[in-house]
Amino acid sequence: PITYVTNGIHTCTWLAPNLKELYNKYLPPYWQDNIQVDSTWEKIDNIPDQKLWNAHIERKEKLIKLIKQNVTNRYVNSGIGYDQIAEVVNKLDPNALTIGFARRFATYKRATLLFKDIARLTQILNDPNRPVQFVFAGKAHPADVEGQNLIKRIHEISLMPQFKGKIFILENYNIGISRYLISGVDVWLNNPRRPMEASGTSGQK
C-alpha cells in the first residue's frame, strides 16, 4: 500500500529557456519524458563547460537586473532618495557568489539562521577577494506574525551599514520572481529545522 506521497516539481515548467536549448541539443531525444532515467543524464557531460557556464551567467545577469529594479521600486515607495538607492543597488556584483533564499517565511525554515553570528557574516560578506551577496524573497501567511517578523528582521539587517548592497530582500514575491531567482543564483540556501521540511521543492526547481 502507498503510505505517503512526496511532493516534487515539474522540471520543464521551471527550466530556464537557454538551458532547455542546451539540453535539447546535447541530451538524448525525448529527454523530457525520461528525466528519471540515469542514461539521460549520462549525456550531460556532452555540454561544453563554457556553454553551460555562459547560460548560467546570462540568467544571473537577468536576475541582477531584476533585483535592481525591485529594490529601487521598494525604496522609492518608501521615500528613500535616488542617491541612497544608487549607493545600494550599484554594489550588486555579477561576479559575486550569489546565494538565494525564496519560499514561504515559516519559522521552521529558519530564514534568519545565518544572522546568528553577525561578526562572522560581516567578515564573509566584506571579503574583497571572495565577494558574496544574499537575496531573499517570499511571503508569510497573513496569520503568521512570527513569519512576518522574520521578513522585518531581514529588512532591518539589510539596512545595516556593513550589509548595504550585500543583502537584498525582494518585494511582491511571485512565480515570475521565483523563476529569475532559481535560474540566476549560484547557491540555493535551504536550512530548515529537522524534520519539519517535507522536501525543499523551492530549491529543486
Briefly describe each language-model feature range:
Residues 1-205:
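Catalytic cores of carbohydrate-active enzymes across secretory and cytosolic contexts
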